[in-house]
Amino acid sequence: QNWPRPQIPP
């Protein structure tokens, strides 16, 4: 299963 990765701030 492919789920979107959590958005990590730069």
From Swiss-Prot:
Top-level taxon of origin: Eukaryota
Keyword match Secreted: yes
Keywords: Hypotensive agent, Metalloenzyme inhibitor, Metalloprotease inhibitor, Protease inhibitor, Pyrrolidone carboxylic acid, Secreted, Toxin
Tissue-level expression: Expressed by the venom gland.
Keyword hit for Lipid biosynthesis: no
Stated role: This peptide both inhibits the activity of the angiotensin-converting enzyme (ACE) and enhances the action of bradykinin by inhibiting the peptidases that inactivate it. It acts as an indirect hypotensive agent. Bradykinin-potentiating peptide 10b-F has much lower activity than the full-length peptide.
Miscellaneous: Bradykinin-potentiating peptide 10b-F is present only in female snakes.
Protein name, as recorded: Bradykinin-potentiating peptide 10b
Organism: Bothrops jararaca
